[in-house]
Curated annotation (Swiss-Prot):
This is ABC transporter C family MRP4. Keywords: ATP-binding, Membrane, Nucleotide-binding, Repeat, Translocase, Transmembrane, Transmembrane helix, Transport. Residues 629-852, 1267-1501 form the ABC transporter domain. Gene3D superfamilies: ABC transporter type 1, transmembrane domain, P-loop containing nucleotide triphosphate hydrolases. ABC transporter that may affect phytic acid transport and compartmentalization. May function directly or indirectly in removing phytic acid from the cytosol or in vesicle trafficking. Required for phytic acid accumulation in developing seeds. Phytic acid is the primary storage form of phosphorus in cereal grains and other plant seeds. Belongs to the ABC transporter superfamily. ABCC family. Conjugate transporter (TC 3.A.1.208) subfamily. Pfam families: ABC_membrane (PF00664), ABC_tran (PF00005). It is a multi-pass membrane protein. InterPro entries: AAA+_ATPase, ABC1_TM_dom, ABC1_TM_sf, ABC_transporter-like_ATP-bd, ABC_transporter-like_CS, ABC_transporter_C-like, ABCC_6TM_D1, ABCC_6TM_D2. ATP binds at residues 664-671, 1301-1308. The lineage of its organism: Eukaryota, Viridiplantae, Streptophyta, Embryophyta, Tracheophyta. Its EC number is 7.-.-.-. One of its GO terms (cellular component) is membrane. Residues 906-918 have a biased composition (Basic residues).
Length: 1510
C-alpha cells in the first residue's frame, strides 16, 4: 500500500498513484519538447539570414508536407466524448462529496476523483491537440494512459463488488462506486483506442505531403525502375526492433492506411533484399547446381537444395515451435494443483496467486511464440515458392524441343501454380515431424502424474489412433493424386480453348468443346467428392481419437486400482485436448509428405529435362572470320531418335553482309534451317559456327501483351531517332496514327487485336531495333499486302539491313532476285544453291517454283490485255454477271450514297480527337466490403440453402455433447483422493463414451453435410462461369489475357472446390464453440461477463479494422497472380524468339519482379493475420487471467472446485478459440473473394442466342449463297470510331468475290461482321433473303465455312481436328485429305488418322496446318466459304494448288477471298476494294483493270512489277 494514502483501499491508492505519475511524466515530456523547440529556433535564428515578415509556420506531423486539412470522423468525436464523459463523472463525484459532506469532507474522499479529474482534463486537451497538430496516431503515452485507466477501473469495480457482497454497504463509497461503474463503457472504448492507436482523423496534405488519399499511380516501367532504385519504401519488418517484432506493430502503418482507404499495390512496402525472389532463386539454384557438379552421376536432390538454402530460418522457427509446445502443456499440468487449492489443500502461502500468475505467463508466452512461429513458416514458404517458381521458369526458357513436346504449356504452368504451391505449403508441416514425439512425451509425463502407470495404455492407444489414421490418409492421398491429374487435364484443355476461342466461334464449335470441358469437370468432381468425403472421415478420426485415448486411459487406471479425481481427470482431459491437434495433424502430415514428395518428384523430373545444348552453335569472334554463318556436314532432327533426319547434308557458308533467300515447297525444312542456325533443333552431326549477334522473326508472330513501343524496344533503351527510323522502315507510321494511343496502345493477348500484317511488322521492328549482326526472317512478308510488302522489302531488307547479314525464308518469288544466294530446299536437303539467274538456267525444283509464280502473273496480264468482248474466253474464269446486273449493283450502291468507282476518302483523325481507350482492360477488382449478396448467393447455390440449418444443428449438438461429457467426468469423480466417487466406474465410462462418441458422430454428420454442400455449390458455380465465358462476345477475349481467365478457372475455382464450404462451416463451428466456452466460464464466474462484452466489442472492432486491409490485400493478391501465370504461358510460347534475341536474362528478371509483386501482398496479408491473432489472443489471455484472479480471490468453499477446474480447462482454450473465431471469419471473407471473382465472370455480357427457336432458317439455307450488305456500319466499341462506314453491295450466289485493300481498310472487320463476331452498329447483312441478325449464332456460323489466316490445330489427332463434331465417316475424311494433298503424308504415318497433333500443332508445318484447315472446309460443304488470307503462309505452287481445289470443289459456292496476293483474287467474278472502311471500287476484275486510275490496278501493278522494282 502506498505510504502517502494510508486510509485508501489498495486499488484506489494504486489508481491515484498511477494517475499522478502519468501526469508528472506528461508534464516532463512537454517541458523537454518545449525546451528543444526553443533551442532549435534560437540556433536557426543565429544561422539563417533575416527575412522580411514573420516566420513561416507549417502545421504537420513531419511526414514530408504541410497539413492542409484534418477532418474529424465519428471515431475521433467518440474519443473526445469519452474523455469529456470521464472528466464530467469525476467532477460530479467531487461536487457530490462537497455538497453532501460540506466542511466535514475528508481528503480521502476527494483525493482520487481530484487526481482523476486533472488527468482526464489533460487527456482531453491532448486529444483536442491531435486535430491541430495532425496526428494520424495518438502518442504512446496517451494510449498507455487509457489502457491503464481502464485496467484500474475494472480492478476497482471488482474490489467494490467483493467488499459490497462480503462486508455490506458500509464498506464502500457509493458515489465512487457508481461513478466507477458508469465510466466502464467509456474507458473500455478508450482502452480499445489505446490498443489500436488511430486518431480517426482524415488527414489531407499539400502536394509535398504524403498523399494519404491518392494512390501512387505509376506506369509499369517507371514503377519497376523506382523499385530497383529503392524509391519505394522497404518493409519495416527488415529493420524492426525486438518489441516491434514481438508485437508485429511494424505492420500497423500499412493497416492504418488500409483503414482509411482501399489499399493499392503501391501502398505495400517492398520486400527486404533477403526475402526477394532473386535472393531465394540464387540460393536454391546454387545449391542445386552444386549437387549436379559434385555428384555428376546422381540426380540432384531438390529437397536437399531447399534445406541447405533455408536451414537458418527453419532452425529459428523450430526454436519458437519448441518453446510454444512446452508452455502449452503448463496449463494442463497445473490444473490438478489448482483444483486441489480450491478444495482447500493449500500447499504454501499465496499459492493461488502464484498459480494464476504462472497460468498467465505461460499463456502469454504461448501467444507470442505461436505468432512468431507461424509468421516464420509463412515467410519460409514464400521463399521456397519464389525460388522454385523462378527455377521452373528458367527451365521453361531452356527446354529442348523433345522436352518441350513432352510438356504442354498448361502442364508447365501447373508446375508453378500447383506443385510449387504445395511444396511451399509444406513449411507449415515441416516441424511436426519432431514435434509430435515431443508432444507425446510431455503428455505422457503429465498423465503419469495423474493416472500413474496407466499412462502406458495412453501410449498404446495413441499409437493405435495414429495407425488407424494412416489408411485414411493414404486413401485421401490417392484421391488427391487422381484429383490433381484430372485437374491438369481440364486446365490443359481450358487453356487451349481460351487461346483458340476465335476459331471455335467461327466454326460454331464452342458448344462441343464446352461439353468436353464439362465432361472433364465431371470426372474431376468424382474424385473431388471422394477427396471431400475422405476429409470428413479424417474429421471423425480427429474427434474420436482423444475420446478413444481417454476411455482406454481411464479404464486402465480403474482396472489397475487407481483412483480418479476431478483435478486429475480435468488435467488429463486438457492434455488429451492438446494432444488432439498433433493426432489430427498426423494424417495431414503423412498426406502432405506424400503430396509434397509427388510434387518434388514432378518438379525434379521437370528440372532434369534436357535443355538446349550450349554447344549447339559455336560463337566465333567477328575479328577471326568473315563468315557470319558456317554450317558443315550438318544433320538435324526435331526427333533425335528417328531414322530420317529433318535436315541432312547441310553445307552452308554465309559471308558477312550477304542476303540469303531460302525457298521451297511446304514441309521442305525452311524454318528448320533457321532453327539450326539458332541452335533450336537437335544437331545429329556437323558443326554450326555463328559470328555476331542474331535477331529472329518467326513465321507465326509472337507478340507480348503490352504496348507496341514495349514490343519494339524489347528491353532496349529508347533512342528516339533510331526508333523513328525503325517505324518508317517497317511501314508502321500510318498504322500507329490510326491506332488508339499510337505506339502506347496496349495490345491484347498474343496481339489478338492487331491484324496479321501489323503483328508481323511489329516483329520486324523489334528485330531491326536490336541492331543485330545477323537477321533470320521466317517468311515475314506473307501477311502483308503487295504494296506494303514491296515497301517493306525495299526499306527493310535493301535499305535498313543493307550492311547486315540477312537470311530470309520466303514464298514470294519476286523477292528472290535481290538475294546474293538462294537456297532451294526439298525433303530436308539443299537441292540447289546459287544466284537467281543461275538457278533458272539449272531448272528442276527452283524452276517449278518460279513457273508457278509466272503463271499467276500471266493470269493478271491476260486480264490487263483483254477487253469486254473476250471476258468469256479467259481460262478458269467463271461466267461473270451480265453488264445489266453490274449496272444494277452500281445503281444500288449509288442509291445508298456511295459511288461505285470512286477512290477512298482519306479520313485523317487528329490526335486530340482520339478517345484514349486502351484495348486491354485492367482486371476487374471489387473494392470495399464483400457484399452480403455474395454470401447469400453462394449459400443458395446448393440445394437452395436447405443444408445450412442442418449443418448448424449438427454443430450445436456436437458442442452440447462435448460439454456434457466433460462436465460428467468433472462432476462424477471425487474432489480429492479421500472422497468417495459419486457413481460406479462402469457407469462413469459408459456415460462418458456415449456422450463423447455421440458428439463425434454429430461432427461427422456436419462434415459430410459441409462436403456435400460445398461440392454442389462448386459444381454449379463452375458450370455457370464456364457457360458465361464461352458465351461471352469475342471482344471479351480480345481485351482479356488468357492467363487472367485461367486464374479464375484454376486458382479461384480450386478455392471454391476445397476451401469455401469448409471455411463457412468452420466459422459456424468456432462461433458455437466460443459460445460454449463463455457459457461454461460464466456459469462458474459470472463476473467474467464484465470483460467478455467489451472484449467482444474490441474483437469485432479489430476484425473490421483488419479486414479493411486484408480484403484488399487478398484482391491485390488475386490480381497479381494473373501476370505471373500469363508471363509463364507467354514466355513458353515465345521461348524460341526470346532465345533468338538473347533475352533470357531480361525475361528472367521480369519474372523475378512479378514474383516480388505477388509476394509483397502475400507477405503483408499473412503478417496481417498474425497481427490480428496476436491481439485477439492477448485480449483473451487477459480475460482468462481476470477469471483466474476472481477464482483465487474467493474464499475456499464458495465455488465447487471441479466446476472451477472445468472453467479453467475451457478457459485455457479461450484465446485460441477467440482468435480462431475472428480469424475464421476473416479467412472466409478473404476466400469468398474467389466466389466474388467467379460471379464477376457469371455476369459477363453474352452474345446473341445460339438458336432462336421461332426464327430458325430452313435446313437447306443458304441455297444460293447471295450476300447483300445494306448500309453496314461497324465499330468495335461504342466509344470508338466507325471501322466500316455504311458499306452497301451484293455478292451474287455462286460467285467468287475477291476482297482487297490496304492494311487497316476493314477487310477482316467485314468478315467478322458476316460471322457476327462483331454486331453491326447499323445496317444489315442479308443472306438468301434472311437477315442474319434475326437468327441464332449457331444457325448462322454452322452454315458458313472459313479458312482463317492463322491455321489452328488442337491437341489430339488428325481425325479430331478435321471432324471435331464426329459427323463424317473415315472414308469422307480420307477423301478430303486426298483432295487437299495430305493423303500421302497421313498414310505414311503409323497411326494414320489417329496421328498425334501436339499443342498448337507444333509437329506440323504452317503450310500443312493450312491444308488441314482446307480439309475442314471440304468436309463441312457449306454454301458460303470465306478465305481470310488463307494462303499467306504457303508457297506460290501450294497457293495455286489450293486455288485449284477451291475452284473445283466449291464451284457452286459463294467464295469470299481476302488476299494480299493479287493472283489469288484476279480470277474472281467480282472484286471489292475497301479503303478506310468504305467501298472504293466494286466491279469485275476486267472492268477495274480497264480503268487506269482505279485503286485495284495500282495494287495489280505493284504486285506484278515489284520484283523488277526491287
Amino acid at each position: 500500500m502506498p505510504p502517502s494514502f494510508p486510509s485508501l483501499p489498495l486499488p484506489e491508492a494504486v489508481a491515484a498513484t498511477a494517475h499522478a505519475a502519468l501526469l508528472a511524466l506528461a508534464a516532463l515530456l512537454l517541458l523537454l519538447r518545449a525546451a528543444r523547440a526553443l533551442a532549435s529556433r534560437c540556433a536557426s535564428c543565429l544561422k539563417a539570414p533575416r527575412r522580411r515578415g514573420g516566420p513561416a509556420v507549417v502545421v504537420g506531423d513531419g511526414a514530408g508536407g504541410a497539413l492542409a486539412a484534418a477532418t474529424a470522423g465519428a471515431w475521433h468525436r467518440a474519443v473526445l466524448a469519452s474523455c469529456a464523459y470521464a472528466l464530467l463523472s469525476q467532477v460530479a463525484v467531487l461536487s457530490y462529496e462537497v455538497a453532501v459532506a460540506g466542511s466535514r469532507v475528508s481528503a480521502r474522499a476527494l483525493l482520487l476523483p481530484a487526481v482523476q479529474a486533472v488527468s482526464w482534463a489533460a487527456l482531453l486537451a491532448l486529444a483536442l491537440q491531435a486535430r491541430a497538430v495532425g496526428w494520424a496516431r495518438f502518442p504512446a503515452l496517451v494510449r498507455l494512459w487509457w489502457v491503464v485507466s481502464f485496467a484500474l477501473c475494472v480492478v476497482i469495480a471488482y474490489d467494490d463488488s467483493r467488499r459490497l457482497i462480503g462486508q455490506g454497504a458500509r464498506a464502500v463509497d457509493y458515489a465512487h462506486m457508481v461513478a466507477n461503474f458508469a465510466s466502464v463503457p467509456a474507458l473500455g472504448f478508450l482502452c480499445l483506442v489505446g490498443v489500436m492507436g488511430s486518431t480517426g482523423l482524415e488527414l489531407e496534405f499539400t502536394e509535398d505531403g504524403n498523399g494519404l488519399h491518392e494512390p501512387l499511380l505509376l506506369g509499369r516501367q517507371r514503377r519497376e525502375a523506382e523499385e530497383e532504385l529503392g524509391c519505394l519504401r522497404v518493409t519495416p519488418y527488415a529493420d524492426a526492433g525486438i518489441l516491434s517484432l514481438a508485437t508485429l506493430s511494424w505492420l500497423s502503418p500499412l493497416l492504418s492506411v488500409g483503414a482509411q482507404r482501399p489499399l493499392e499495390l503501391a501502398d505495400i512496402p517492398l520486400l527486404a533484399h533477403k526475402d526477394r525472389a532473386k535472393s531465394c532463386y540464387k540460393a536454391m539454384s546454387a545449391h542445386y547446381e552444386r549437387q549436379r557438379l559434385e555428384y555428376p552421376g546422381r540426380e540432384p536432390s531438390l529437397t536437399w537444395a531447399i534445406l541447405k538454402s533455408f536451414w537458418r530460418e527453419a532452425a529459428v522457427n523450430g526454436t519458437f515451435a519448441a518453446v510454444n509446445t512446452i508452455v502449452s502443456y503448463v496449463g494442463p499440468y497445473l490444473i490438478s494443483y489448482f483444483v486441489d487449492y480450491l478444495s482447500g489443500n493449500i500447499a504454501f502461502p499465496h499459492e493461488g496467486y502464484i498459480l494464476a500468475s504462472i497460468f498467465f505467463v505461460a499463456k502469454l508466452l504461448e501467444t507470442l511464440t505461436a505468432r512468431q512461429w507461424y509468421l516464420g513458416v509463412d515467410i519460409m514458404g514464400i521463399h521456397v515458392k519464389s525460388g522454385l517458381t523462378a527455377m521452373v521458369y528458367r527451365k521453361g526458357l531452356r527446354l529442348s524441343n523433345a522436352s518441350r513436346q513432352s510438356h504442354t504449356s498448361g502442364e508447365i504452368v501447373n508446375y508453378m501454380a500447383v506443385d510449387v504451391q504445395r511444396v511451399g505449403d509444406y513449411a507449415w508441416y515441416f516441424h511436426d515431424i519432431w514435434m509430435l514425439p515431443l508432444q507425446i512425451i510431455l503428455a505422457l509425463a503429465i498423465l503419469y502424474k495423474n493416472v500413474g502407470i496407466a499412462m502406458v495404455s495412453t501410449l498404446v492407444a495413441t499409437v493405435l489412433s495414429i495407425a488407424a489414421s494412416v489408411p485414411v490418409a493414404k486413401l485421401q492421398e490417392h484421391y488427391q493424386d487422381k484429383l490433381m491429374a484430372s485437374k491438369d487435364e481440364r486446365m490443359r484443355k481450358t487453356s487451349e480453348c481460351l487461346k483458340n476461342m476465335r476459331i471455335l466461334k467461327l466454326q460454331a464449335w464452342e458448344d462441343r468443346y464446352r461439353l468436353q470441358l464439362e465432361e472433364m469437370r465431371n470426372v474431376e468432381c468424382r474424385w473431388l467428392r471422394w477427396a471431400l468425403y475422405s476429409q470428413a472421415a479424417v474429421t471423425f478420426v480427429f474427434w474420436s481419437s482423444p475420446i478413444f485415448v481417454a476411455v482406454i486411459t481411464f479404464g486402465t487406471c480403474i482396472l489397475l486400482g487407481g483412483q480418479l479425481t476431478a483435478g486429475g481427470v480435468l488435467s488429463a482431459l486438457a492434455t488429451f485436448r492438446i494432444l488432439q491437434e498433433p493426432l489430427r495433424n498426423f494424417p495431414d502430415l503423412i498426406s502432405m509428405m506424400a503430396q509434397t514428395r509427388v510434387s518434388l518428384d514432378r518438379l525434379s523430373h521437370f528440372l532434369q529435362q534436357e535443355e538446349l545444348p550450349d554447344d549447339a552453335t559455336i560463337n566465333v569472334p567477328q575479328s577471326s572470320t568473315d563468315k557470319a554463318v558456317d554450317i558443315k556436314d550438318g544433320a538435324f532432327s526435331w526427333n533425335p531418335y528417328t531414322l530420317t533426319p529433318t535436315l541432312s547434308d547441310i553445307h552452308l557458308s554465309v559471308v558477312r553482309g550477304m542476303r540469303v533467300a531460302v525457298c521451297g515447297v511446304i514441309g521442305s525444312g525452311k524454318s528448320s534451317l533457321l532453327s539450326s542456325i539458332l541452335g533450336e533443333i537437335p544437331k545429329l552431326c556437323g558443326h554450326v559456327r555463328i559470328s555476331g549477334t542474331a535477331a529472329y522473326v518467326p513465321q507465326t508472330a509472337w507478340i507480348q501483351s503490352g504496348n507496341i513501343e514495349e514490343n519494339i524496344l524489347f528491353g532496349s533503351q529508347m533512342d528516339r531517332q533510331r526508333y523513328k527510323r525503325v517505324i518508317a522502315a517497317c511501314c508502321l507510321k500510318k498504322d500507329l496514327e490510326l491506332l488508339q494511343y499510337g505506339d502506347q496502345t496496349v495490345i491484347g493477348d498474343r496481339g489478338i487485336n492487331l491484324s496479321g500484317g501489323q503483328k508481323q511488322r511489329v516483329q520486324l521492328a523489334r528485330a531491326l531495333y536490336q541492331d543485330a549482326d545477323i537477321y533470320l526472317l521466317d517468311d515475314p512478308f506473307s501477311a502483308v499486302d503487295a504494296h506494303t510488302g514491296s515497301e517493306l522489302f525495299k526499306e527493310y531488307i535493301l535499305t535498313a539491313l543493307a550492311t547486315k547479314t540477312v537470311i530470309y525464308v520466303t514464298h514470294q518469288v519476286e523477292f528472290l532476285p535481290a538475294a546474293d544466294l538462294i537456297l532451294v530446299l526439298k525433303d530436308g536437303h539443299i537441292t540447289q544453291a546459287g544466284k537467281y539467274d543461275d538457278l533458272l538456267q539449272a531448272g528442276t525444283d527452283f524452276n517449278a517454283l518460279v513457273s508457278a509464280h509466272k503463271e499467276a502473273i500471266e493470269t493478271m496480264d491476260i486480264f490487263e490485255d483483254s477487253d469486254s468482248d473476250t471476258v468469256s474466253s479467259i481460262p478458269n474464269k467463271r461466267l461473270t454477271p451480265s453488264i445489266s446486273n453490274i449496272d444494277n449493283l452500281k445503281n444500288k450502291m449509288c442509291e445508298n450514297g456511295q459511288p461505285s468507282n470512286t477512290r477512298g476518302i482519306k479520313e485523317k483523325k487528329k490526335k486530340e480527337e482520339r478517345k484514349k481507350k486502351r484495348t486491354v482492360q485492367e482486371e476487374e477488382r471489387e473494392r470495399g466490403k464483400v457484399s452480403s449478396k455474395v454470401y447469400l448467393s453462394y449459400m443458395g447455390e446448393a440445394y437452395k440453402g436447405t443444408l445450412i440449418p442442418l449443418i448448424i444443428l449438427a454443430q450445436t449438438m456436437f458442442q452440447v455433447l462435448q460439454i456434457a461429457s466433460n462436465w460428467w467426468m468433472a462432476w462424477a469423480n471425487p474432489q480429492t483422493e479421500g472422497d468417495a466417487p459419486k457413481t460406479d466406474s462402469v457407469v462413469l465410462l459408459v456415460v462418458y463414451m456415449s456422450l463423447a462418441f455421440g458428439s463425434s458422430l454429430f461432427v461427422f454428420m456436419r462434415s459430410l453435410l459441409v462436403a456435400t454442400f460445398g461440392l454442389a455449390a462448386a459444381q454449379k458455380l463452375f458450370i455457370k462461369m464456364l457457360r458465361c465465358v464461352f458465351r461471352a462476345p469475342m471482344s471479351f477475349f480480345d481485351t482479356t489475357p488468357s492467363g487472367r481467365i485461367l486464374n479464375r478457372v484454376s486458382v479461384d475455382q480450386s478455392v471454391v472446390d476445397l476451401d469455401i464450404a469448409f471455411r463457412l462451416g468452420g466459422f459456424a463451428s468456432t462461433t458455437i464453440q466460443l459460445l460454449g466456452i463463455v457459457a461454461v466460464m460464466s456459469k462458474v464466474t459470472w463476473q467474467v461477463l464484465i470483460l467478455i462484452v467489451p472484449m467482444a466489442v474490441a474483437c469485432m472492432w479489430m476484425q473490421r479494422y483488419y479486414i479493411a486491409s486484408s480484403r484488399e490485400l487478398t484482391r491485390i493478391l488475386s490480381v497479381q497472380k494473373s501476370p505471373v501465370i500469363h508471363l509463364f504461358s507467354e514466355s513458353i510460347a515465345g521461348a524460341a524468339t526470346i532465345r533468338g534475341f538473347g533475352q533470357e536474362k531480361r525475361f528472367m528478371k521480369r519474372n523475378l519482379y512479378l514474383l516480388d509483386c505477388f509476394a509483397r501482398p502475400l507477405f503483408s496479408s499473412l503478417a496481417a493475420i498474425e497481427w490480428l491473432c496476436l491481439r485477439m489472443e492477448l485480449l483473451s489471455t487477459f480475460v482468462f487471467a481476470f477469471c483466474m484472479a476472481i477464482l483465487v480471490s474467493f474464499p475456499p468453499g464458495t465455488i465447487e472446485p471441479s466446476m472451477a477446474g472445468l472453467a479453467v480447462t475451457y478457459g485455457l482454450n479461450l484465446n485460441a478459440r477467440m482468435s480462431r473465431w475472428i480469424l475464421s471469419f476473416c479467412k472466409l471473407e478473404n476466400r469468398i473473394i474467389s466466389v466474388e471473382r467467379i460471379y464477376q465472370y457469371c455476369r459477363l455480357p453474352s452474345e446473341a442466342p445460339l438458336i432462336i427457336e421461332n426464327c430458325r432458317p430452313p435446313s437447306s439455307w443458304p441455297q444460293n449463297g447471295n450476300i447483300e450488305l445494306i448500309d453496314l456500319k461497324v465499330r468495335y466499341k461504342d466509344d470508338l470510331p466507325l471501322v466500316l462506314h455504311g458499306v452497301s453491295c451484293m455478292f451474287p450466289g455462286g460467285k467468287k468475290i475477291g476482297i482487297v485493300g490496304r492494311t487497316g481498310s476493314g477487310k477482316s472487320t467485314l468478315i467478322q461482321a458476316l460471322f457476327r463476331l462483331i454486331e453491326p452498329t447499323g445496317g444489315k447483312i442479308i443472306i438468301d433473303n434472311i437477315d442474319i441478325s434475326a437468327i441464332g449464332l449457331h444457325d448462322l456460323r454452322s452454315r458458313l465455312s472459313i479458312i482463317p489466316q492463322d491455321p489452328t490445330l488442337f491437341e489430339g489427332t488428325i481425325r479430331m481436328n478435321l471432324d471435331p463434331l464426329e459427323e463424317c465417316t473415315d472414308q469422307e475424311i480420307w477423301e478430303a485429305l486426298e483432295k487437299c494433298q495430305l493423303g500421302e503424308v497421313i498414310r505414311s504415318k503409323e497411326e494414320k488418322l489417329d496421328s498425334p497433333v501436339l499443342e498448337n500443332g507444333d509437329n506440323w508445318s504452317v503450310g500443312q496446318r493450312q491444308l488441314i484447315a482446307l480439309g475442314r472446309a471440304l468436309l463441312k460443304q457449306a454454301k458460303i466459304l470465306v478465305l481470310d488470307e488463307a494462303t499467306a503462309s504457303v508457297d506460290t505452287a501450294t497457293d495455286n494448288l489450293i486455288q485449284k481445289i477451291i475452284r473445283s470443289e466449291f464451284k457452286d459456292c459463294t467464295v469470299c477471298t481476302i488476299a494480299h496476293r493479287i493472283p489469288t483474287v484476279i480470277d474472281s467474278d467480282l472484286v471489292l476494294v475497301l479503303s478506310d472502311g468504305k467501298i472504293a471500287e466494286f466491279d469485275t476484275p476486267q472492268r477495274l483493270l480497264e480503268d487506269k486510275s482505279s485503286m485495284f490496278i495500282q495494287l495489280v501493278s505493284e504486285y506484278s512489277t515489284r520484283s523488277s522494282c526491287i
